[in-house]
């Protein structure tokens, strides 16, 4: 096995097939993740456009039949309509392989794009966002999704149904995040945007659709619960609704659900940052404690559930 480099001599079966065949290159220590990702998008023959917003390179992927921004003379695909917009950040914290956060969700979405193409479904966009990970002291206004959301609105995509995927490679339990609910409840009126009622309504609609999709697919388990911050917070701060979805192993989901019953305030600790205190941090699911550090390795992934995720994304597009 190659130590700390690209592909292993014993590459797992799932990583031998497109689009996952560049996954191990993507998580290598010195990987040029932007270059690898854009080349892989080209290799699987999807249209794409890279849009730089305040120094962050966001990669948009379109169905093969849709023109990219450049070839459409500046008109963004689906402008004025309500496509599904699936987001996943492709940056990672320095020193972490980023196997689950968030490399696997990136490749899952490419796999979902191929599945959607096979079914002839083309009312979707994917955006791989830059700068989801913030450094100490940075506000959410520095998050890539915050400045991107402002552009999305100016492109006529304010009606897009945004689903954000983060850390979706470990376990089979889908966690439908309620973090934005807590932020809205704890925010002072001065920080709320004028269209906040519309945003709240849209978040509820996205969540209902996620739950309906899970029911339609007969997923074994779904949990509504607060989760660590993701791009949904940046979207929210800019006045766009987005629903984050993540995944956990069943035993961790059970323990977390029990914790939330005993400690209804625990979600507020995530919002305030107090969860970082050692006494509280150890209560987080183990999967989440492994993120943003050297423990976020491929050994923690559960490939037997990868298709479940892809089917969920496809299911979102085949609903209402």
Predicted features, each with a name:
Residues 27-35, 99-103, 107, 139-143, ...:
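Soluble non-cytosolic domains of exported or imported proteins
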Residues 82, 86-94:
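Glycine/charged-rich beta-loop-alpha catalytic/anionic-binding loops adjacent to active sites
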Residues 252-320:
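His/Asp/Glu-rich mid-to-C-terminal helical/loop segments that flank catalytic regions of hydrolases
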Residues 43-52, 212-224:
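Short secondary-structure junctions
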Residues 68, 93-202, 208-212, 219, ...:
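Acidic/histidine-rich catalytic neighborhood of metal-dependent amide-processing enzymes
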Residues 20-29, 47, 93-102, 138, ...:
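Second-shell loop/turn segments in exported
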Residues 12-77:
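A non-catalytic alpha/beta surface segment that caps or lines the substrate-entry region
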Residues 1-38, 91, 282-296:
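N-terminal capping segment at the start of a domain
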């Amino acid at each position: 096995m190659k130590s700390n480099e690209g592909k292993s001599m014993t590459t797992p079966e799932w990583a031998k097939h497109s689009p996952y065949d560049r996954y191990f290159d993507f998580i290598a220590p010195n990987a040029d993740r932007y270059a690898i990702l854009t080349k892989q998008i080209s290799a699987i023959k999807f249209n794409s456009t890279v849009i730089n917003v305040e120094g962050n390179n966001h990669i948009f992927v379109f169905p093969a039949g849709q023109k990219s921004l450049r070839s459409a003379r500046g008109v963004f695909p689906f402008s004025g309509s309500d496509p599904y917009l699936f987001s996943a950040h492709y940056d990672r914290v320095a020193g972490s392989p980023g196997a689950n956060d968030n490399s696997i969700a990136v490749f899952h979405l490419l796999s979902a794009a191929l599945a959607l193409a096979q079914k002839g479904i083309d009312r979707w966009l994917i955006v791989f966002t830059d700068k989801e990970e913030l450094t100490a002291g940075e506000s959410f206004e520095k998050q890539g999704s915050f400045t991107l959301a402002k552009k999305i609105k100016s492109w006529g995509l304010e009606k897009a149904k945004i689903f954000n995927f983060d850390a979706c490679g470990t376990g089979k339990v889908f966690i439908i995040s309620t973090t934005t609910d807590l932020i809205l409840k704890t925010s002072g009126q001065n920080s709320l945007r004028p269209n906040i009622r519309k945003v709240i309504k849209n978040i509820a609609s996205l969540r209902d659709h996620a739950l309906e999709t899970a029911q339609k697919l007969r997923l074994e388990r779904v949990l509504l619960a607060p989760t660590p911050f993701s791009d949904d917070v940046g979207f929210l701060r800019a006045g766009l609704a987005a629903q984050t979805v993540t995944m956990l192993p069943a035993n961790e989901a059970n323990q977390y659900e029990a914790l939330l019953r005993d400690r209804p305030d625990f979600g507020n600790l995530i919002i305030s940052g107090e969860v970082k205190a050692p006494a509280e941090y150890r209560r987080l699911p183990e999967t989440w404690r492994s993120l943003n550090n050297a423990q976020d390795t491929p050994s923690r992934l559960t490939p037997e559930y990868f298709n479940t995720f892809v089917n969920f994304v496809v299911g979102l597009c085949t609903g209402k």
